[in-house]
Amino acid sequence: MKRNNNLIIPLLKIKKLLKRKGCKRIQNSALVFFSKVLQYLIEELLEISMNVSILNKTKKYRIKPKDISWSIQSDPEFNLLFRNIIIPSSGRISNKLNRIIQRSFKFKSFKFDDYEKSDYSSKTF
């Protein structure tokens, strides 16, 4: 496998995890693509979480589990992706705080039940 300096997540670790889950043969290009997608998702989540932590009254540059949970719940795409995930020591998000976060990021409120009932593929969030 070639060494790629732009990747944060090691390719061999991804390959071992996928093999443990049942993938017998994996192309190296698929591993690089998978690593890039994971890296992009992590960067986006950390960026939104940092903005949420700055928006709080403390205005500190430390991301807490609660900030990650708030950013997941305020973003419709992350909310859909992580709908069954529980983040330890993140607490519950209040509706008032959720509205403040959504207004500051200009997100549209989103419910997964609405997504199942109709086709949102042509609409933007």
UniProtKB/Swiss-Prot annotation:
GO terms for cellular component: nucleosome; nucleus. Pfam families: Histone. It is found in: Nucleus; Chromosome. Keywords: Chromosome, DNA-binding, Nucleosome core, Nucleus. Signal peptide: none annotated. GO terms for biological process: cell motility; heterochromatin formation. It comes from the Eukaryota. Core component of nucleosome which plays a central role in DNA double strand break (DSB) repair. Nucleosomes wrap and compact DNA into chromatin, limiting DNA accessibility to the cellular machineries which require DNA as a template. Histones thereby play a central role in transcription regulation, DNA repair, DNA replication and chromosomal stability. DNA accessibility is regulated via a complex set of post-translational modifications of histones, also called histone code, and nucleosome remodeling. This is Histone H2A.v3. It comes from Dictyostelium discoideum. The gene is H2Av3.
